[in-house]
Swiss-Prot record:
It is a peripheral membrane protein. This is ATP synthase subunit gamma, mitochondrial. One of its GO terms (biological process) is proton motive force-driven ATP synthesis. Changing residue 207 to I: In strain: D273-10B/A1. PROSITE patterns: ATPASE_GAMMA. The gene is ATP3.
Length: 311
């Protein structure tokens, strides 16, 4: 008789604890898996993802110093070039609309082929689209697969040339010169009254902004108000040579700036992903332990109930 009373009390105690666990599950929105095995598999998957994001953050951090050096080096050349155009008072010429509706502007949009770096590519695509609202007939050259895929959705007819294989490493002048040569030979870039380069400018280690950089063609350079103040040989090819060099150099500057912004954005994105994965691991670890406790509780109830019936 005494053993039966003790057994009944133990049964009521275990069943009460089981009911409390069940109430806890109903109020916990994290619990989306019915079995212990599913929760365990989910937890293992999140831990594997956390390892990947942490590794990618470390890789991005090591590349960031190299990207910063490339950005600073390109910026020095850009500052010297901008000083020349400032002293020459060079500005884009006002071009009236043509009767045939021919493109008045060439847009060069620069990103890379890689993702997992936040909204850096989509933000640049939005900036290009806003610019196209004012210049719907502009021709577009995309550098990098990401910007190409973004603009193909809305402006497929404007894209005339696409270049990929960009962003694997810090850009060099040789790389930018090859791209500039392709723009001159394939797109006849020198015939456009206006050329605009769109790229991502790193404002700080945590932020960036899409920027636009104008490129002056040979005719614009030659007609600069103060261009004659410089001691230049009588060679008629000087404005053209200066334009071609400027195109390559500005491409390098934009690519270096964009590369640094992308690496920084990827590091921040992977850092946030690692933190989110850590939070999910904590939540699912609690869920796993509670689910496991519920399984043990059910087994205890079955054992005690069976013992009571046998007694």
């Amino acid at each position: 008789m005494l053993s039966r009373i003790v057994s009944n009390n133990a049964t009521r105690s275990v069943m009460c604890h089981q009911a409390q666990v069940g109430i806890l599950y109903k109020t916990n929105p994290v619990r989306t898996y019915a079995t212990l095995k599913e929760v365990e598999m989910r937890l293992k998957s999140i831990k594997n993802i956390e390892k990947i994001t942490k590794t990618m953050k470390i890789v991005a951090s090591t590349r960031l110093s190299k990207a910063e050096k490339a950005k600073i080096s390109a910026k020095k050349m850009d500052e010297a070039e901008q000083l020349f155009y400032k002293n020459a008072e060079t500005k884009n010429l006002d071009v009236e609309a043509t009767e045939t509706g021919a493109p008045k502007e060439l847009i060069v949009a620069i990103t890379s082929d890689k993702g997992l770096c936040g909204s850096i590519h989509s933000q640049l695509a939005k900036a290009v689209r806003r610019h196209l609202n004012d210049q719907p007939n502009a021709d577009i050259v995309t550098i990098g697969d990401k910007i190409k895929m973004q603009l193909l959705r809305t402006h497929p007819n404007n894209i005339k040339l696409s270049i990929n294989g960009i962003g694997k490493d810090a850009p060099t002048f040789q790389e930018s010169a090859l791209i500039a040569d392709k723009l001159l030979s394939v797109m006849k870039a020198g015939t456009y009254p206006k050329i605009s380069i769109f790229y991502n400018d790193p404002v700080s280690s945590l932020s960036f902004e899409p920027s636009e950089k104008p490129i002056f063609n040979a005719k614009t350079i030659e007609q600069s108000p103060s261009f004659g103040k410089f001691e230049i040989d009588t060679d008629a090819n000087v404005p053209r040579d200066l334009f071609e060099y400027t195109l390559a150099n500005q491409m390098l500057t934009a690519m270096a700036q964009g590369y640094a912004a992308e690496i920084s954005a990827r590091r921040n994105a992977m850092d946030n992903a690692s933190k989110n994965a850590g939070d999910m691991i904590n939540r699912y670890s609690i869920l796993y332990n509670r689910t496991r406790q519920a399984v043990i509780t059910n087994e205890l109830v079955d054992i005690i109930t069976g013992a009571s019936s046998l007694g």
